[in-house]
């Protein structure tokens, strides 16, 4: 991917940009809401803070752990081999600590790796979009014109932007000031 080059700001301009905003702050929340629980709290807090924040939009972004699926399955097999004293079957590389800890957390909940749905990016974005709508519904706040679907995949090249309702809206809001 091509390197991004941002313009150099003067020290005064940098300090100005970093100052805490006064008054009502316009925000866009770009979130993978269905991925972890913290995003629901962020949306709820922002929505319930109209004296501080003006939510221009909440946009759903893609997420996926499908690229970790094989690693997680192998880590689970590795741990099962150790548990069953089948050490000789563990000839391949030791799984990463990341994968081992993930499997341990699953097992603590009584879940096997094969029971986990490893969604693709398009599914992750749609799950996030639906979760944002759920948060708005639970708060009894209308979502029409406020919640937008994002891209269905990750950016592969800076030269090939991915068009989505969210990206078009973000561009329009940036242009309108």
Regions found by a protein language model. Name each.
Residues 1-177:
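N-terminal acidic, glycine/proline-rich low-complexity segments
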């Amino acid at each position: 991917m091509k390197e991004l080059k941002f313009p150099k700001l003067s020290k005064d301009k940098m300090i100005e940009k970093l100052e805490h905003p006064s008054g009502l702050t316009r925000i866009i929340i770009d979130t993978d809401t269905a991925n972890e629980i913290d995003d629901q709290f962020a949306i709820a807090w922002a929505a319930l803070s109209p004296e501080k924040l003006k939510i221009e939009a909440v946009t759903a972004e893609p997420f996926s752990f499908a690229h970790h699926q094989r690693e997680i399955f192998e880590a689970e097999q590795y741990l099962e081999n150790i548990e069953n004293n089948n050490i000789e079957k563990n000839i391949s590389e030791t799984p990463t600590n990341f994968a081992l800890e993930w499997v341990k957390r699953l097992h603590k909940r009584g879940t096997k790796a094969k029971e986990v749905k490893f969604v693709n990016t398009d599914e992750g974005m749609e799950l996030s979009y639906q979760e944002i709508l759920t948060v708005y519904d639970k708060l009894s706040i209308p979502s029409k014109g406020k919640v937008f679907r994002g891209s269905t995949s990750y950016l592969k090249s800076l030269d090939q932007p991915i068009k989505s309702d969210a990206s078009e809206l973000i561009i329009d809001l940036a242009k309108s000031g």
